[in-house]
C-alpha cells in the first residue's frame, strides 16, 4: 500500500511528490499524459518570471527542474493512465482505480489535476485530422520550427494573439483570422499586434484545407468571409488553430468519494488544502480557498501543505511540518553532488 497517491503530474503534483518523499512517505504519481509537467507543456518557450527567487527562464527548463525535483525520492510513476474512481474504504485506506484496470491502495490521496483534463478544440472540417502529424498545429512547441514560414493562425483569444506576436519575429509572414469583427484579447496584446507585421482578416474562418500531392500536408487554405460568403484561396506552410480548450472533470463528477465543490471545475477547500473528506487533499489550480493565487509559486505552497496534512493523517504524532532542506540530513549525500559544481 502506498502512503499517498498523487493524481496529476504538473507543478503542484510534482512538488507534492518531492515534499511527501522528504517526509518519508511512499508515493505514487498517476497522470493521464505521456509525460510529467502538466499544462506547462502548452507553452514550453514562454518565459516564466513569477516564481519567487528563480531567475526568468523558458518554461521547458521549469518543466525539467520540477520533474527532476519531483522524482528525487523515486516515487512510482504511472503515465498515460486515467483515474476513473477514488473510493474511501475506511480510515487510512483509499482505492484509486484507473482505466487500465489497476486498483491502487493508498493511505491518503492528493488531487493535483489543475483545471481538469484539457484538450485543444479541434478544427471541425473535412480531412483536418490527417494533417495533425504534419503542418496543422494546436500547440506551438517551438518557435524555431516556423522560421521563414508563411503561417496562418485561426483564433481571436489571448493565445492566438500571443502566438502571432511571438511568431512575427520568426516567420516570413503571419496571417491572423477570426470570426468576429474585433479581437477579444487583452488590450496590451492587441496594441502590440498593431505594431507588428501581422496581417489580420476579421469575419473570416477556414472553409477548406487543400492537401499536397501526397495528401499528408496542407498546401493551401480556402478562407471564407462570413459576412459576404466570398472565398479566397491562399498558400501557407503551417496552420495553427487556437480556438480554446475543452475541459473535462469527469473524475470529480463520477468519483465514489464525493468532495464538496466550489464550482464545476474547482474543489472547495481550505488554505491548508484540506477538503470535505479526511485523508483526501488537493493542491494547485484544482482547489479553491480564500487565500488562493493562481500561480505556479502558490501551487508549491499548496503542495507542501497537502503533503504535511497527509503525513499527519497517516501518523497523527508526526511533526506538523518537514525539516527545512538546508539542515536536513536526508540531503547529506545529495548535497555533496551539488556542491561539486561550486568547488
Curated annotation (Swiss-Prot):
Positions of transmembrane segments: none
One term of GO molecular function: NADP binding
This protein's UniProt keywords: FAD, Flavoprotein, NADP, Oxidoreductase
ATP-binding recorded as keyword: no
Residues reported in the UniProt entry to bind FAD: 31, 39, 43, 83, 118, 285, 326
Record's catalysed reaction(s): 2 reduced [2Fe-2S]-[ferredoxin] + NADP(+) + H(+) = 2 oxidized [2Fe-2S]-[ferredoxin] + NADPH
Record flagged with keyword Lipid metabolism: no
Cofactor dependence: FAD
Domain of life (superkingdom): Bacteria
Gene3D superfamilies: FAD/NAD(P)-binding domain
EC number assigned by the record: 1.18.1.2
Record text on cofactor binding: Binds 1 FAD per subunit.
Record text on subunit structure and interactions: Homodimer.
Family indicated by similarity: Belongs to the ferredoxin--NADP reductase type 2 family.
Protein name (record): Ferredoxin--NADP reductase
Amino acid at each position: 500500500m502506498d502512503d499517498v497517491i498523487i493524481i496529476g503530474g504538473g507543478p503542484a503534483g510534482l512538488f507534492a511528490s518531492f515534499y511527501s518523499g522528504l517526509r518519508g512517505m511512499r508515493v505514487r504519481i498517476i497522470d493521464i499524459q505521456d509525460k510529467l509537467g502538466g499544462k506547462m507543456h502548452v507553452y514550453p518557450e514562454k518565459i516564466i518570471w513569477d516564481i519567487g527567487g528563480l531567475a526568468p527562464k523558458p518554461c521547458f527548463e521549469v518543466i525539467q527542474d520540477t520533474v527532476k525535483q519531483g522524482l528525487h525520492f523515486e516515487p512510482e510513476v504511472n503515465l498515460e493512465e486515467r483515474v476513473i474512481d477514488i473510493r474511501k474504504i475506511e480510515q487510512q485506506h483509499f482505492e484509486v482505480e484507473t482505466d487500465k484496470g489497476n486498483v491502487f491502495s493508498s493511505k491518503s490521496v492528493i488531487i493535483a489535476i489543475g483545471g481538469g483534463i484539457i484538450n485543444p478544440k479541434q478544427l471541425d472540417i473535412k480531412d483536418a485530422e490527417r494533417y495533425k502529424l504534419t503542418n496543422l498545429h494546436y500547440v506551438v512547441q517551438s518557435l524555431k520550427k516556423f522560421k521563414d514560414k508563411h503561417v496562418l493562425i485561426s483564433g481571436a483569444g489571448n493565445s492566438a494573439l500571443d502566438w502571432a506576436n511571438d511568431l512575427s519575429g520568426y516567420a516570413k509572414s503571419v496571417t491572423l483570422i477570426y470570426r468576429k469583427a474585433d479581437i477579444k484579447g487583452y488590450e496590451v496584446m492587441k496594441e502590440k499586434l498593431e505594431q507588428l507585421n501581422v496581417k489580420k482578416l476579421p469575419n473570416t474562418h477556414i472553409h477548406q484545407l487543400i492537401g499536397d500531392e501526397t495528401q499528408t500536408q496542407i498546401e493551401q487554405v480556402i478562407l471564407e468571409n462570413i459576412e459576404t460568403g466570398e472565398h479566397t484561396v491562399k498558400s501557407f506552410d503551417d496552420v495553427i488553430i487556437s480556438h480554446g480548450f475543452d475541459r473535462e472533470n469527469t473524475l470529480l463528477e463520477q468519483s465514489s468519494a464525493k468532495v464538496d465543490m466550489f464550482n464545476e471545475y474547482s474543489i472547495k477547500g481550505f488554505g491548508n488544502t484540506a477538503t470535505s473528506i479526511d485523508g483526501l487533499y488537493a493542491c494547485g489550480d484544482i482547489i479553491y480557498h480564500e487565500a488562493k493565487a493562481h500561480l505556479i509559486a502558490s501551487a508549491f505552497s499548496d503542495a507542501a501543505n497537502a503533503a504535511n496534512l497527509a503525513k499527519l493523517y497517516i501518523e497523527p504524532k508526526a511533526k506538523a511540518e518537514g525539516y527545512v532542506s538546508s539542515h536536513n540530513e536526508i540531503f547529506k549525500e545529495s548535497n555533496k553532488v551539488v556542491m561539486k559544481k561550486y568547488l
